[in-house]
A protein has these predicted regions:
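Hydrophobic alpha-helical bundles in membrane proteins
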Residues: 130-132, 143, 156
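Residue-level structural signal for beta-strand termini and adjacent loop
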Residues: 99-100, 169
Length: 352
C-alpha cells in the first residue's frame, strides 16, 4: 500500500512563497497576504480558522497543506523562573527552547537543529550527534507556541544546533520574524550565535541586521581547535576578517562568547591574545561559567578567577560581562541542552 504523502507546512513560508502557493492553486494573489495574517498575526492552528478565505479555497488549501503548529510535549520550571520546553518535530526528533525572564526583558532561546555537527568538547548537544535541520516553521513554532509568547521581548538563536549550518531555514525564519506581514519584530531584538560557518556567516551578515554573537572560547588556533572542531573548517582569523568587513556602525552589535575553563584558557596570556585579536572591533566580551558535563575533562573556573580574567580584559579597554547562569537546575544553562532520548537512541522518556 502506498503511504499517504505528508502535507506541506504553511508555517515558516514567506509572503513570496505563499504567493507562489496560492497562484499554483489558482487562488487570487491577495490570498497570500490573508494567509500570512492568519499564520503570524492571529496565530491560528488550523486552516479552517482562516474565515476570510472562501470555504472552497480553505478546502483546497487543506488538501495539500497544514498549518504546522504544535505545542510543547513537556516543560520544566527552574527555581529562578527559567522554563525549558521540549518539542517534537516532524522527523520525530526532539528539540528544546528556553524561556529566560529578567526584570527588563523576556528572552526565548531557540533551537535550529536536532543535535549538532559541530561536536564542541564542552557542549552536550553535540554529544547526541546530528539528526537533522529544523524547517523555518519548526523554528518559528517555538516562538509562537511557548506559554510566554506574548511576553517575549528578545529571541536568541543559541539553543540546540549551529544556526548557520542551517542558514537557509534560519534566515527564512528571521525574514518572517522581522517582516511587517510576519511577526513584525525589530532585528535589534534578535541575536544569532555561531561558531563560524563561512557561507552561512556571509549570508547572515549580508541579509540581516540582527545582532551577532561569536563562540570564541580560545584565542589561539590550536587551543580553539581542541575545544571546537569548527576551527579547522573556518579559523577564527577568517571569522574576524568577515566581521571587520561587515557594517556594525549602526545599532547592530557583535559580541564574543568565552566559556572560561580552569587551566585551559584562563591565563593572562589568553587575555592578552584575545585583546590583540579583537582590537579595532567595537564589541562586548561575555564570559560564561562552564557547567560540568559527564565524561568531559574540563573544569569550571572559580568566581574569583572569572573576576580576575574580566579585570584583565577591562584593563585593555573591553566592555566585559560575566553571564549569570540561569536554569542550571533543569539543565537549561549554556552548553547543557540535549535530550537523553536521542542520546540513548529512542527511549520513551526525554530528560537531561
Amino acid at each position: 500500500m502506498t503511504p499517504t504523502p505528508q502535507k506541506r507546512i504553511l508555517l515558516g513560508l514567506t509572503l513570496e512563497e505563499l504567493t507562489t502557493v496560492v497562484t499554483e492553486l489558482g487562488m487570487p494573489r491577495f490570498t497570500a497576504r490573508q494567509i500570512a495574517g492568519w499564520l503570524y498575526d492571529k496565530r491560528v492552528s488550523e486552516i479552517d480558522e482562516m474565515t476570510n478565505i472562501s470555504k472552497a479555497n480553505r478546502l483546497l488549501l487543506s488538501e495539500h497543506f497544514e498549518v504546522g503548529r504544535s505545542l510543547p510535549i513537556t516543560s520544566e520550571l527552574s527555581r529562578d523562573g527559567t522554563r525549558k520546553y521540549l518539542f517534537r518535530v516532524r522527523s520525530g526528533g526532539l528539540v528544546e527552547a528556553v524561556y529566560i525572564p529578567e526584570k527588563d526583558r523576556a528572552t526565548l532561546c531557540i533551537s535550529s537543529q536536532v543535535g549538532c555537527k559541530m561536536d564542541c568538547l564542552f557542549c552536550m548537544t553535540g554529544k547526541q550527534g546530528f539528526r537533522g535541520n529544523l524547517s523555518a516553521g519548526e523554528i518559528l513554532n517555538q516562538v509562537l507556541s511557548v506559554e510566554e509568547s506574548p511576553k517575549l521581548t528578545n529571541i536568541v538563536y543559541m539553543g540546540m544546533g549551529e544556526p548557520l549550518d542551517n542558514a537557509t531555514n534560519v534566515l527564512s525564519s528571521i525574514s518572517v520574524m522581522t517582516a511587517s506581514w510576519g511577526l513584525g519584530w525589530s532585528p535589534k531584538r534578535i541575536t544569532l550565535s555561531t561558531v563560524g560557518v563561512r557561507r552561512g556567516l556571509e549570508r547572515f551578515l549580508g541579509e540581516t541586521t540582527c545582532h551577532l554573537a561569536v563562540s570564541l572560547h580560545n584565542p589561539f588556533h590550536e587551543g580553539r581547535l581542541e575545544l571546537m572542531h569548527a576551527e579547522g573548517g573556518m579559523p577564527l582569523e577568517d571569522t574576524l576578517r568577515m566581521i571587520r568587513e561587515a557594517d556594525f556602525t549602526g545599532q547592530r552589535r557583535v559580541s564574543f562568547e568565552y566559556i572560561v575553563f580552569e587551566g585551559v584558557n584562563d591565563s593572562l596570556q589568553h587575555a592578552e591574545e584575545l585583546a590583540r585579536l579583537l582590537r579595532g572591533i567595537p564589541c562586548r566580551i561575555n564570559l560564561i561559567p562552564f557547567h560540568q558535563i559527564p565524561g568531559v575533562p574540563l573544569r569550571p573556573l572559580t568566581a574569583q578567577g572569572m573576576e580576575r580574567f574580566k579585570g584583565w580584559l577591562e584593563a585593555r579597554g573591553y566592555v566585559t560581562t560575566i553571564r549569570t547562569s540561569r536554569g542550571e537546575d533543569i539543565s537549561a544553562a549554556c552548553g547543557m541542552l540535549s535530550t537523553k532520548e536521542q542520546m540513548a537512541g529512542g527511549a520513551s522518556q526525554a530528560s537531561h
